[in-house]
Amino acid sequence: QQRAADGERPATLLELFDLIKSSGKPVRLNLETKLTPESGAATPDPLTFARLVVDAVRASGMAERVTVQSFDWRTLRHVHTLAPEIGTACLTIESENFDTVRRKTGAPSPWHAGGNLADHAGSLPKLVHASGCRTWSMFWRNLTQADLAEARTLRLTVLPWTVNDPAEMARLIDWGVDGIITDYPNRLRDVMTEKKLPLP
């Protein structure tokens, strides 16, 4: 687990890339752009944000080891246009306190870069696919077996987040998800070991 250390500052993206390359290990990175449709002047605009990420990834030669994910799909659209060699993952959540899908409104969600769920018969996997993402990463409680099956027909990689309970990890592995995002990789490794799955 992380521990706070007074006086420490977060590493820059380039510093992180250098550290990973110096390790000699085949580490992959899932980079999340922390942007919202309501960010306003508090953050760079989506195109500038995407350019900054793409420039850092390319400068470090890390394109094959990076996926860029976001709830705000505007940055993902720009990343896809600027650097189609960099993978993108569409994040979604439908909960009482945070809902990027806005299924009940019937209108396009501001999180989805103009994409409208209604144009895809209410299918979130189809909307993700139409957006250009090849990975769909949803709040784990929102994933259904029907959605997973539909995502499979669209050849989407399915990565639920953030799964910290070993029983839920086991259930989702049995369903056939492609991977799991967790705060506790040691727990996931234990579940994988129990299931005799190869460890990364």
Give residue spans per PLM region:
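Metal-dependent phosphodiesterase/phospholipase catalytic core, i.e.
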Residues: Q1-E96, P108-H120, H129-W140, R152-L154
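C-terminal active-site rim and adjoining tail of enzyme catalytic domains
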Residues: L91, F98-P200
